[in-house]
From Swiss-Prot:
Primary gene name: lepA
Taxonomic lineage from the root: Bacteria, Bacillati, Bacillota, Bacilli, Lactobacillales
Pfam families, sorted: EFG_C, GTP_EFTU, GTP_EFTU_D2, LepA_C
GO cellular component: plasma membrane
Protein keywords: Cell membrane, GTP-binding, Hydrolase, Membrane, Nucleotide-binding, Protein biosynthesis
EC number, as in UniProt: 3.6.5.n1
Listed name of the protein: Elongation factor 4
SUPFAM superfamilies recorded: EF-G C-terminal domain-like (SSF54980), P-loop containing nucleoside triphosphate hydrolases (SSF52540)
Length: 610
């Protein structure tokens, strides 16, 4: 293809993402666009076509960004090349959204006409504005009886400040007016710019590991071209490879002769060392390199840490390999080796939130056939010691001795909770119960309020979202960001089973609630840990002080069952022998602790009972 033809082709490219709050219909709109552009045949069509991870389809959510190329025959008679990047909506995966937007010139903002603007609608719109994208508002689910398209448009104008005069009312489910969205993409989203003759400059916005092809890079070419046989250099790692294949996803991989400035596609180069190909790096021509790399991504800081341990210690290296491969596909995941007296060798992993942690554990078990135990998640505490030093503690078991500690600071988040007026009282009560500090309250309209609280992250990570939904009948939506560290009166609580401290069950609590939490956890463990044939004392302790105790009763095996009646001496002998055996087992016996026990530290009593 000559330069003039390439420039003409570049003018017909449109790169865009679909962003929205969770459940507002992003993936359904992506399905309709693929269907209406004949990218997917009716026979191959299924719901959530871009959510190719089985886990995404089961949960009905998007976890990974996904890029697909399609051709649209517009009303002006020209064929346009669309690169659509579907993005997640859950707050835990906002990092995926920011990476997607960096590869685009425009974003379709989908808002559910029955729900209106919600917390992640705002958060994702601000991400799009930060990336200087053209935003097309689309009002979805207008076919539902409870839809209020005009009220939703007013919310978008009042709360986001976007003009909605040309917003399109659609039903992604039935396809109503989706053709108008396709035309708006052509008319309103600008074509990419980028010098076709400049040295190659391409941003890696995603990557995954393929057993046959090595690392497969998802790239947005900003300048120049790349083709099979080219020598490419990773500007960060300085590694050089020869390109084996370039292509597009449509949505299956299709090899192409080249990728040029403006294209979104994939590059393979027999990359076997995962560390060479980091998301956010720039690839350039090794023989004619560009002078400076593209701005990469802000490295995400994990918000939640948990221990991941193989149930079989021999699988430790398998777990390491699996985590390395997942990290390639999920740059927000961090991990480092750690050991536990109770669980052996494993990894301390950092996650963006509880859903992220859940998804990683499930992917490790499914995709890599691992059997894992996950410890209760915790946050990073800043521990100021009497000697003037400060230690960051991610694992409660590593908390220094209480005599060394001068003060402890914990991370707080700034939580924005959008809620109907009727539920403001319930939201404030929940936030107070979770040690929240009130900031402000903004009235968004006559019926909706945005309540802002500063809440300890440790109170948010587990059941806050579920409790928020249940106390507001599902009407509240939450967005949060790390705010700062604040001093708190915190103590470490150890759990002892049969007199032995189980390091993996240690947790941090505010001193005011420590005794109550200790009693709660002890009684929960009593329900969860199966009875064994000796009595197990369950104790909670702060330092050497026991603050709670309960006992798991022993099974009583009927050793006299086979004795005929009328032999009291024999019966007494057997019972005495059983008693002596139990004493011995108690001294050497190991308590079998199920996975549920490690999560019980964070669960509510109702969840244990169900």
């Amino acid at each position: 293809m000559d330069l003039a033809a390439m420039k003409e082709r570049q003018q017909r490219i449109r790169n865009f993402s679909i962003v929205a709050h969770i459940d507002h219909g992003k993936s359904t709109l992506a399905d309709r666009i693929l269907e209406m552009t004949d990218t997917i045949s009716k026979r191959e069509m299924k719901n959530q076509i871009l959510d190719d991870m089985p886990l995404e389809r089961e949960r009905g959510i998007t976890i990974k960004l996904n890029a697909v190329a399609l051709t649209y025959h517009a009303q002006d008679g020209q064929d346009y090349i669309f690169h659509l990047i579907d993005t997640p909506g859950h707050v835990d995966f906002s990092y995926e959204v920011s990476r997607s937007l960096a590869a685009c010139e425009g974003a379709i903002l989908v808002v559910d006409a029955t729900q209106g603007v919600e917390a992640q609608t705002l958060a994702n719109t601000y991400l799009a504005i930060d990336n200087d994208l053209e935003i097309l508002p689309v009002i979805n689910k207008v076919d539902l009886p409870s839809a209020d398209p005009e009220g939703t448009k007013k919310q978008i104008e009042d709360e986001i400040g976007l003009d909605t005069d040309e917003a399109v009312d659609i039903s992604a489910k039935t396809g109503v007016n989706v053709d108008q969205v396709l035309e708006k993409i052509v008319q309103d989203i600008p074509a990419p710019t980028g010098d076709l003759e400049a040295p190659l400059k391409a941003l890696i916005f995603d990557s995954k590991y393929d057993d046959y092809r090595g690392v497969v890079l998802s790239v947005r070419v900003k300048e120049g071209t790349v083709k099979k046989g080219d020598k490419i250099e990773f500007m960060n790692s300085k590694a050089v490879y020869e390109v084996a294949e370039v292509g597009i996803n449509s949505p299956k991989p299709l090899a192409r002769d080249f990728l040029m400035a403006g294209d979104v596609g994939y590059v393979t180069a027999a990359i076997k060392d995962i560390k060479d190909a980091r998301v956010g790096d720039t690839i350039t021509d090794a023989n004619h390199p560009t002078d400076k790399p593209l701005a990469g991504y802000r490295q995400m800081q994990p918000m939640v840490y948990a221990g991941l341990y193989p149930t079989d210690n021999a699988k430790f290296n398998d777990l390491r390999d699996a985590l390395e491969k997942l990290q390639l596909n999920d740059a927000a995941l961090t991990f480092e080796p750690e050991s536990s007296q109770a669980l052996g060798f494993g990894f301390r992993c950092g996650f963006l939130g509880m859903l992220h942690m859940d998804v990683i554990q499930e992917r490790l078990e499914r995709e890599f056939d691992l059997d894992l135990i996950t410890t209760a998640p915790s946050v990073t505490y800043h521990v100021n010691l009497h000697d003037g030093s400060t230690r960051n503690v991610e694992n409660p078991a590593e908390m220094p001795d209480v005599t060394e500690i001068k003060s402890i600071e914990e991370p707080f988040v700034k939580a924005s909770i959008m809620v109907p007026n009727d539920y403001v009282g319930a939201v404030m009560e929940l936030c107070q119960r979770k040690r929240g500090q009130f900031d402000t309250m903004e009235y968004l309209s006559d019926t909706r309020v945005n309540v802002i609280y500063h809440i300890p992250l440790s109170e948010i990570i587990y059941d806050f979202f579920d409790r928020l939904k249940s106390s507001t009948r599902g009407y509240a939506s939450l967005d949060y960001e790390i705010d700062d560290y604040r001093p708190s009166d915190l103590v470490k609580i150890d759990i002892l089973l049969n007199g032995d401290r189980v390091d993996a069950l240690s947790f941090i609590s505010h001193r005011d609630f420590a005794e109550e939490r200790g009693r709660e956890i002890a009684s929960k463990l009593k329900k969860i840990i199966p009875r064994q044939n000796f009595e197990i004392p369950v104790q909670a302790a702060i330092g050497s002080k026991i603050i709670a105790r309960t006992n798991i009763k022993a099974y009583r095996k009927d050793v006299t069952a086979r004795i005929h009646t009328g032999d009291p001496d024999r019966r007494a002998k057997l019972l005495d022998k059983q008693k002596r055996g139990k004493k011995r087992m108690k001294a050497v016996g190991k308590v079998e602790v199920p996975q549920a026990a490690f999560m019980a530290v964070l669960q509510t009593d109702e969840e244990i009972d169900n």
